[in-house]
Amino acid sequence: MRQSVSSLNPPNGEVYWREPSVSGGSPGFSAVSTPVIQGDRLLISGLMFQLDQAQPAAKILWPDTPSGTRRILSDTSTPLFKDDFVYSPRSGGLFVCLDAATGRELWQTNTVTALRRGACVHLTPNGTSLFLFTDQGDLVRAELTPTGYRELERVHLLEPTSPLFENKFAWSAPAFANRNIFVRNDRE
């Protein structure tokens, strides 16, 4: 999503609509988070769209910033869209809850992962709580609600090994199967 978000006609590739966007802060950096849809709302990186249900069209709900500016929530983490709220780390590591309709920040915490460029948290719903796998190799079980973040448990699973600037990261998403978690870094 380095230059734009586009809606295409699948059979012929015709562009229905396009919204210019800048997701990368530097050459070689782009947002890689997966788009998230709930009902008629589509969240791509830091852009929340209201999709038109009658025709292939959309309008931006938030943020209220000019086209072509850096509009991003997280470079690497896919947000969780739950009810009328969005839960996600920001690119610098702060973890936030946003009102899905307005983008207004309801709360933030700096306790999930380190505050640094390249911060990443993978979110996996698990009943009434969530598993959060951090770029530091920690698995966290937490409750996320519009009123706040509550950490229930934390365990360190593996060392981060992927270098970026002076820091090391564990960016790979975890996999869950048969009550097991599978995680990896560059060495194991």
Model regions and ranges:
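Noncatalytic, solvent-exposed loop/strand surfaces
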Residues: 1-188
